[in-house]
């Protein structure tokens, strides 16, 4: 079940930008490399922040310091991912836009971004937000778990796009 129909994909695939992407041998592998490097930077930063929230790594550092270290990487890598992903879609519109797994990836991406924004916002409002009481600590553990699951789901769904319809 795709939200975008084949006629749109045919039109998009026939645009001059799509034609250049499709016919220049090095563009798609370069875009894929950029996309993979950006997701590696974003994913590792998000996971390390989440693991700190769990208390698994860097327990001796305040959470605000961990956030200061990793959130800039996340917010730098995200637009790189979105731009490289958009060009990959333009280059191969049917591969993504007619694939249900692509829409699963987009839903997981939206969830992951919202959770990450919520985690960052809570710390900017109060640096000790997740450490104030047991209820907040449990909520932080839950948010970190959702974050890890959502970002992992983005990775997995992104990889599966090549192998599903």
State what each model feature region is.
Residues 1-165:
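Polytopic transmembrane helical bundles with strong interfacial aromatic enrichment
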């Amino acid at each position: 079940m795709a939200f975008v129909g084949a006629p749109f994909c045919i039109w998009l695939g026939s645009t001059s930008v799509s034609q250049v992407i499709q016919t220049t041998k090095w563009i798609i592998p370069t875009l894929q490399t950029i996309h993979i490097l950006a997701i590696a930077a974003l994913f590792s930063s998000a996971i390390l922040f989440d693991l700190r929230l769990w208390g698994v790594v860097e327990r001796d550092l305040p959470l605000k310091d961990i956030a200061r270290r990793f959130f800039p990487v996340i917010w730098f890598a995200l637009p790189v991912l979105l731009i490289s992903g958009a060009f990959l879609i333009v280059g191969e519109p049917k591969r993504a836009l007619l694939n249900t797994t692509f829409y699963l990836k987009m839903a997981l991406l939206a969830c992951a971004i919202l959770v990450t924004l919520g985690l960052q916002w809570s710390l900017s409002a109060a640096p000790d937000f997740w450490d104030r009481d047991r209820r907040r600590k449990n909520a932080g553990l839950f948010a970190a778990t959702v974050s890890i699951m959502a970002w992992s789901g983005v990775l997995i769904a992104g990889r599966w796009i090549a192998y599903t319809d």
